[in-house]
């Protein structure tokens, strides 16, 4: 225990963020272990891959938390460009999965490059917004252009849920930057127009929204099973491997992992998960308010928002409060791309917090 505490202190980790992340990872490992018990031929592979990605995620958090602001920006630029190129390649060169072209597939490895765009774009957007605020140059046009490129990629794949996530975080960054209303209102109008056009022309978007608003029991099998699992779980759950979610839901390891936890681990564990996410978000918000550096403020706000918004979308989908988006629960759902992206977000947050405290 002494060694662990000295390790935390020597790395300047913020315990209000790092410890909840560790707890979320542990809960996720138990959840994936439960699912892997149901898959005889992939029992060892599924849980082993998940544990490997979790360990890799912790390494990423530690390494990124040591970056200077300068190196953080350089790192983000390099990986943003790399992820953009890979994301474009998924549309033209890689086969579709469930009607979408989001994955780079090499041998037995699949990777979703748009996941890396989340933390890196937030850093670049914060940098450009800070520059525009002080110099009133072309940087805001470049910011809009980068977001427009990401939007085009996401809607082409198509990944409307990710588009909503990006836009929500980006527009809050802009509002935080105190830009003129004549700039903000046209952007909001373009978003509403994009939403309407997506509903009209993108069949998968129309299907999910219609299914959410007008579906009956037969149309909403996964959601009904998800809701049923929460009522079955009670306070303490039915025990690892004793639930029905992993048997009946093909996406129990990703989209509906929260439903599995609610059934097998109970309401108390499901509530603790929410509490951990809230603690992380509140801590990020508190630190962001003590800095006078616009770049750090926008970066912390954006990274915190994208993490909590993704959490809200996943959990709300499980509870039928939002249409299903195919979005993972950070640090809990199975998926290497998601774990790496979430780890980058937390690593970036920790290094930004360290710099904010030094001011």
Protein language model annotation of sequence segments:
Residues 2-24, 30-157, 220, 315-330, ...:
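Membrane-helix boundary/helix-loop-helix interface segments in multi-pass membrane proteins
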Residues 77-84, 136-156, 160-200:
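Hydrophobic alpha-helical segments of polytopic membrane proteins
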Residues 88, 152, 171-172, 308, ...:
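Hydrophobic residues within the alpha-helical transmembrane core of Major Facilitator Superfamily
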Residues 52-56, 60, 264-281, 345:
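Hydrophobic alpha-helical transmembrane segments
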Residues 97, 101-103, 183-273, 295:
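Hydrophobic, glycine- and aromatic-enriched re-entrant/interface helices and adjoining loop segments
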Residues 131-141, 183, 284-303:
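Membrane-interface helix-loop-helix junctions at transmembrane boundaries of multi-pass membrane enzymes
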Residues 129, 167-183, 245-269, 328-345:
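Interfacial segments of multi-pass membrane proteins
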Residues 288-326, 332:
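Loop-to-helix entry and N-terminal half of a specific, functionally important transmembrane alpha helix
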């Amino acid at each position: 225990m002494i060694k662990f505490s000295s390790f935390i202190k020597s790395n300047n980790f913020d315990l209000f963020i790092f410890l909840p992340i560790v707890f979320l990872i542990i809960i996720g490992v138990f959840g994936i272990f439960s699912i892997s018990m149901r898959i005889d031929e992939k029992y060892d592979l599924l849980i082993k891959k998940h544990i490997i990605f979790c360990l890799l995620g912790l390494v990423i958090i530690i390494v990124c938390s040591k970056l200077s602001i300068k190196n953080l920006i350089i790192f983000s630029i390099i990986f943003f460009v790399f992820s953009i190129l890979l994301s474009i390649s998924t549309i033209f060169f890689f086969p579709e999965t469930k009607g979408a072209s989001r994955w780079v597939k090499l041998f037995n490895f699949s990777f979703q490059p748009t996941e890396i765009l989340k933390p890196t774009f937030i850093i670049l957007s914060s940098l450009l917004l800070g520059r525009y605020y002080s110099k009133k140059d072309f940087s805001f046009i470049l910011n809009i252009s980068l977001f427009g490129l990401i939007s085009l990629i996401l809607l082409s794949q198509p990944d409307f849920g990710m588009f909503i996530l990006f836009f929500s975080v980006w527009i809050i960054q802009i509002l935080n930057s105190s830009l003129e209303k004549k700039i903000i209102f046209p952007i909001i109008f373009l978003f509403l127009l994009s939403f309407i056009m997506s509903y009209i022309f993108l069949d998968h978007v129309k299907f999910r929204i219609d299914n959410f608003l007008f579906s009956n029991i037969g149309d909403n099998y996964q959601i009904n099973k998800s809701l049923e699992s929460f009522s079955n779980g009670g306070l303490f759950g039915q025990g690892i491997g004793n639930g029905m979610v992993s048997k009946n839901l093909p996406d129990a390891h990703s989209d509906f992992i929260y439903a599995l936890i609610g059934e097998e681990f109970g309401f108390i564990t499901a509530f603790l998960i929410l509490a951990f996410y809230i603690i992380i978000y509140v801590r990020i918000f508190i630190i962001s308010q003590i800095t006078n550096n616009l770049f750090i403020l926008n970066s912390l706000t954006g990274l915190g928002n994208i993490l909590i918004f993704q959490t809200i979308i996943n959990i709300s989908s499980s509870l039928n409060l939002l249409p299903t988006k195919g979005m993972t629960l950070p640090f809990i759902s199975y998926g290497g791309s998601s774990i790496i992206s979430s780890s980058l977000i937390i690593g970036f947050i920790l290094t930004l917090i360290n710099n904010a405290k030094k001011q």
